[in-house]
Amino acid sequence: MMGYEQMNQMTMTTTAMMKNYNKKGLINTPQKKMTRRSVSAIDGGAAATAKEGDRRQNIKTLDLSGMSLASLSASSINLASISKLDLSNNNIQKIPESLVARMLNLWALDLQSNQLKTLPNSIGCLSKLKFLNVSGNYLQSLPKTIEDCRSLEELNANFNELTRLPDAIGFELTNLTKLSVNSNKLVLLPNSVSYLTSLRVLDARLNRLSSLPEDLENLVNLQVLNVSQNFQHLTTLPYSVGLLISLVELDVSYNGITVLPDSLGCLRRIQKLSVEGNPLISPPFEVVEQGLEALKQYMSEKMTESYKKTPTKKKSWGIGKLVKYGLSSSPGRSTGREDGKEGFINVSDYRQIDGIASPRHVSLFNPRRLLSPLSAYFSPPRY
């Protein structure tokens, strides 16, 4: 299992990959950095005329990083042939709509460390885009059209001024494996984030988050969750944090959390849990300082005691889900599919959408759907 440092290192190769990556024949031009003389890129009105032969070549990788560019004019380039574009570390204030709309084969775009306040709506035309880095700009929002970049695997929007993310981002970007939005002004994450079922890393530290989505258990591949340093804004964690079956690292340090959810005792794969800098009451400091295993045992025992004391109607949500996931077992309880209906949306609450039964709020990944026969959700048409 990869640790956060390893995964972070893996991600850092994206920028380097844009310069020297050679795979499946995508790069068929010499790997040398483009200069003002080899590309007609205009910087503050100063332009250099390229040779006619250079104008007609089909460039696959275009690196214009660190050239102090303030604007772009790439009329001499066959933009449709570009697969990787690096415009990082410049002074670019605006990306032309027409420029982006022409780069239909682009799969890696690096715009970090510029002066961007907005991204063009035409970014939604980049249907093959897999890596997008817009960190270190002045973005206050991401265009809704980014939801059309359905091939996107990594989105880095760190160090901006984002106050919100597109509402449906989680419903559309189903291939996203890393979402990094640290050092922004986010007050909340949209509920749709809970349906990024391919997500492995979620980094939302250094924001102003006051809460997290309730249905985090849908993130079955999530390995790293970092919501540290939201300070006094984040005071509670949802119970579903303890239902993240693949979670390896959880960092909730330096927040205003007083009580950790008992469900943390069910995190079987957890290897690193950071809770320092919180005014914790439960678990007490004496338990926390004993380390991860002691904390997990304490939370697990506390959850069991709470379950025994709680009236039946109030037990169903948490324990019902834990049993379904195989994270908990109780005497006299079956873990089979026929085991009651506690903790799940009633079938009557579902409606047909293109032949698939979904709840009214479009739950794309409900545990009941996973563990029930397909026939329960794929019904023959009614006439």
UniProtKB/Swiss-Prot annotation:
Cited Pfam families: LRR_1, LRR_8
Protein name per Swiss-Prot or TrEMBL: Plant intracellular Ras-group-related LRR protein 8
Start-end of each LRR repeat: 56-79, 80-102, 104-126, 127-149, 151-173, 174-197, 199-219, 221-244, 245-268, 270-290
GO BP annotation list: mRNA cis splicing, via spliceosome
A Gene Ontology term for the protein's cellular component: mitochondrion
Gene3D superfamilies reported for this sequence: Ribonuclease Inhibitor (3.80.10.10)
Role of this protein: Leucine-rich repeat protein that likely mediates protein interactions, possibly in the context of signal transduction.
Motif GVYW mapped to chain: 291-298
Organism from which the protein derives: Arabidopsis thaliana
SUPFAM superfamilies: L domain-like
Tissue specificity of this protein: Widely expressed except flowers.
Record family assignment: Belongs to the SHOC2 family.
Leader sequence segment: none
InterPro entries recorded: Leu-rich_rpt, Leu-rich_rpt_typical-subtyp, LRR_dom_sf, LRR_domain-containing
Superkingdom per UniProt: Eukaryota
Keywords, comma-separated and alphabetical: Leucine-rich repeat, Repeat
